[in-house]
């Protein structure tokens, strides 16, 4: 699977360079998400621009990513193609995952999550 990660101070950006996220690549994608979380990445932003198709195992991998980062920070998808967004919406995953249009909005979502988590622990 083609997958690149750029690490920044408050988050990392993962780019999936794969047109199909299906049963052939989803186990590796799940593993990548879990490894990043175990390596101390608090929030992960995922660039989905190159992904044209996901099947149920691909959606499952995205859910694993969402779960892996929900405790420490946030999991954000951006640049989601129309077809993939339809599949995410049909499966109602758009109700549990943070999905935004671009990288700037994704970075803002990370900042907002940090502020909200900070308020929860300050009380």
Enumerate the predicted regions with their spans:
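A charged, well-structured terminal subsegment
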Residues: 101-123
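Residues that form or immediately flank small-molecule/cofactor binding pockets and catalytic motifs
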Residues: 10, 82, 104
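Amphipathic alpha-helical interaction surfaces in cytosolic regulatory modules
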Residues: 21-97
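General small-molecule cofactor/ligand-binding pocket signal
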Residues: 4-6, 78, 98-100
